[in-house]
Each structure stands twice: as structure tokens, then as C-alpha cells.
Amino acid sequence: MAKIKKGDQVIVIAGKEKGKQGTVLSVSEDRVKVEGLNLVKKHQKPNRVTGAEGGIVTQEASLHISNVAILNATTQKADRVGYQVIDGVKTRVYKSTGESVAVAK
């Protein structure tokens, strides 16, 4: 189960984008897309039905989920996330500080 959710602020901890920060756009089983990171050029065919033009499009490629860590808002460092039941509600908490993770919108 992925502990990183759409809208979370993350930092890349491995690979060519190491040290860069961004917001998670989408999460699949073991991969995440981060806004503005791991950009690739894709050759797009024109589509008559949708009216989309052809050409070379720059878009985000996915990163493996093990190469990113959630960014702790108070310490501005990479952190791990756990779950705790607080007042009968299961919430995500930072492992280092025990603070509740802000809900992504």
C-alpha cells in the first residue's frame, strides 16, 4: 500500500532528479508522477477526432515510488509516514516528529 497520496509534497531521494521537490500528480501501484520532474519528450500523432495537433510534447514520466519521500513541512526534510488511530480516525503521521500529515487537496 502506497503511503504517498496525490497532492503530497515530495522530494526525490535517488536518480537524476535527486534533491528536487514537487507535488504528486498521480500514484499507481509502485510509481508516481511528480509535477515538473522527470520530463520526457513524446512524439504525438495528430488526432482528427479530438482535434489534437501532432508534434513533440513534453510531459512528466513516472518515477518509482521508492525514489521519492514525503516532505515534512516543518523540518523541510524527507520523512517517512506511518498510520495512527487518533480519536477513532486513521491518520497519516510523520515518523520523525509524530505530527499529523496535512491532508492533500
Curated annotation (Swiss-Prot):
Keywords: Ribonucleoprotein, Ribosomal protein, RNA-binding, rRNA-binding. The keyword Ribosomal protein applies. It comes from the Bacteria. Pfam families: KOW, ribosomal_L24. One of its GO terms (cellular component) is ribonucleoprotein complex. InterPro entries: KOW (IPR005824), Rib_uL2_dom2 (IPR014722), Ribosomal_uL24 (IPR003256), Ribosomal_uL24_CS (IPR005825), Ribosomal_uL24_KOW (IPR041988), Translation_prot_SH3-like_sf (IPR008991). GO terms for biological process: translation. GO terms for molecular function: rRNA binding; structural constituent of ribosome. The keyword Lyase does not apply. One of two assembly initiator proteins, it binds directly to the 5'-end of the 23S rRNA, where it nucleates assembly of the 50S subunit. One of the proteins that surrounds the polypeptide exit tunnel on the outside of the subunit. Belongs to the universal ribosomal protein uL24 family. Part of the 50S ribosomal subunit. This is Large ribosomal subunit protein uL24. It comes from Acinetobacter baumannii (strain AB0057).
